[in-house]
């Protein structure tokens, strides 16, 4: 396993993704920064699901293993479907995540196709739309071709007086440094347009020895400590959860 327990997971998260800023800003700078918005690349939905009575994870895994993107495709629209299983132990709950890279609303279409394939017999989901907009902050391509990976999802809030405009400088520094390490890692930033004071940060980890690589190449780097301070100055995380994730191909 990549993360032996949540405590160790939190340690990785603290070092690699806790949120932040530049330094003190005067009023005009803060107002200017508040006007800067993320350039989103996709919209995203997260649906919480639970296995129906009489069905197990083996049934779900069998269903997902035979599910092909081609059966869900509509007009060459680019999208991703990820399934998240809570760590360290999951019994009957999971999350389905849709990422839509187009301006067209494809969620109802995909849900209908899943239903026709028999998904409703296996599990029930809360299909309350709570649309997020997101962007990839960095994606080191080293060995990122796995459909199975570990995902750490953090729900965070900006500290008073801080926002994406102040945070982006620390993000850019973080991305530049991590990219130079050639680690199989991806970071995503998601937010709601009607709630700019909060966001979701996602770490996608594609390698089993990720923690040791981070420890040797990043934690001991003095630049990492400065970036961590900037992150903490800008924002705080409410909670962090770790999942075994699966990309439907």
Say what each PLM segment does:
Residues 1-9:
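Positively charged n-region of N-terminal signal peptides that target proteins for export
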Residues 22-225, 230-249:
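Short S/T/G/P-rich N-terminal loop/turn motif that feeds into the first structured element of a domain
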Residues 9-19:
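Sec-dependent N-terminal signal peptides
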């Amino acid at each position: 396993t990549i993360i032996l327990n949540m405590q160790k997971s939190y340690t990785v998260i603290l070092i690699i993704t806790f949120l932040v800023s530049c330094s003190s800003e005067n009023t005009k700078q803060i107002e200017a920064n508040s006007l800067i918005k993320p350039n989103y690349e996709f919209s995203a939905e997260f649906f919480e699901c639970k296995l129906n009575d009489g069905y197990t994870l083996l049934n779900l895994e069998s269903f997902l293993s035979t599910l092909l993107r081609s059966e869900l495709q509509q007009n060459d629209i680019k999208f991703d479907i990820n399934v998240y299983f809570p760590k360290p132990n999951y019994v009957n709950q999971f999350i389905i995540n849709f990422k839509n890279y187009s301006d067209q609303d494809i969620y109802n279409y995909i849900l209908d196709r899943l239903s026709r394939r028999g998904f409703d017999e296996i599990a029930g989901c809360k299909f309350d739309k709570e649309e997020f907009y997101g962007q990839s902050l960095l994606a080191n391509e080293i060995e990122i071709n796995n459909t199975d990976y570990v995902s750490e999802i953090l729900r965070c809030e900006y500290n008073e007086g801080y926002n994406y405009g102040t945070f982006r400088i620390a993000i850019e520094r973080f991305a530049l440094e991590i990219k130079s390490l050639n680690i199989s890692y991806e970071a995503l930033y998601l937010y709601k347009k009607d709630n700019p004071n909060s966001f979701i940060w996602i770490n996608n980890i594609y390698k089993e020895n990720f923690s040791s690589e981070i420890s040797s190449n990043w934690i001991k780097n003095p630049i990492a400590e400065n970036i961590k301070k900037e992150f903490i100055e800008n924002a705080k995380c409410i909670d962090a959860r770790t999942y075994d994730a699966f990309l439907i191909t």
